[in-house]
Amino acid sequence: MKYFVSGHRDLSYDDFRKYYVPVILDIIRSDRNPIFVVGDCKGVDKYAMDFIYTSLSQMHGYMESPYYLVIFHMFDSPRNTPNGLPEEELEKKGVLFAGGFKSDEERDASMTNVSNYDIAFVKDNRWDSGTAQNIKRRHGI
């Protein structure tokens, strides 16, 4: 299954650990072939890519899929990469990149389209945020 991780740029790492880490770990334990899709922004995107990469980079050779993490970015290159590593090194370890999007909305809609499930937390009831729009898009709201 493919999981779209989205969240606020200003979420604290403590809140990421509280709301996202348990869900991601449950998926890693229960899905033998998880594929996570994330954006390349700071905040939840960066926390998620680092956590997922650190958790799965040693296991990807045992998984059915040759990749487990896809980072979607605008333009030619991502703003952030897992643990700040170069794209070439990451691609050898199960991380793919999908770029060239012209807007956040185009990129996020593509992530919704290629995934089956959202991992998202709306902070402070901010239902006009990009994170909330991702959830609404999934459910046709």
Question: What do these predicted regions represent?
Answer:
Residues R9-I141:
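Acidic/glycine-enriched connector segments
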Residues M1-R9:
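Short, hydrophobic/glycine-enriched beta-strand segments
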